[in-house]
Amino acid sequence: MRETTVDQLAAAIDQGAPVVDVREPAEFREGHVPGATNIPMGQLTVRLGEIDRDRPVHVVCASGNRSSAMADVLTANGFDAINVVGGTSAWARSGRPIEK
């Protein structure tokens, strides 16, 4: 599993990279990386078909712990998954926009 920073994530998003947020829906509604798709970690394996296998997918949570575990799951299922170190918290601390 690869890892990336929020700065690298911002550049990837500018290029159209997909982002999957594995937090619970209530957490997601409180604020998320713009354009992220919410697939809670408990639903990830049954919703794999919603994720594009042909492109690297960035995986985010609040701090990077859940997303790290879920990036491993995606990698094991044939995806090129990239964990976002520090998660949404690091994204917000960097001053980047939060979508609600």
Q: What positions do the PLM features span?
A:
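Short, surface-exposed ligand- or partner-binding patches at beta-edge/loop junctions that are enriched
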Residues: 60
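Rhodanese-like catalytic fold shared by cysteine-dependent sulfurtransferases
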Residues: 1-18, 24-56, 65-100
